[in-house]
Amino acid sequence: MTVGRTWAVVLTGLHGDLIEVEADLSSQTPAFVIIGLADKAIGEAHQRVHNACANSELPLPRRKLTVNLSPASLPKQGSALDVAIAIAALATEHALDRDSLAQTAHIGELGLDGRLRPVPGVLPAVAAAARMGIRKAVVPFANREEAALVEGVEVL
């Protein structure tokens, strides 16, 4: 599989929008490109994701990796998409369960060592994901109790 997909959530105030995170591998010169109206923090995600994956012994492929954050017209900000970007990127070459990824929102910042760091706004993010049919959420441990307040979502 060369295209990996999963879900994330971006917040505007307390309003959350579901974002499809797609990663595609191509045989071009190695690069890591993020597209889809991302701010500087998301633009820097490629370095956090690359180092976190390498330091977790899950190195990313040495090919061109393009990550699309859709809908492209919606502004995206902050580091809470790091985990979703990493999962979509890893799904391009690793056998991750597509059905599970299609039902899961990944929310959190990655440390360079691979740790998940807490992010603000997990409660409204998970609530927005639940309203849009998402039934599982991967969040940093420090945000777990907050995320668990949303009924109908399994917090991992």
Regions found by a protein language model. Give the residues of each.
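Peripheral, non-AAA+ core regions of ATP-driven protein-machinery
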Residues: 1-156
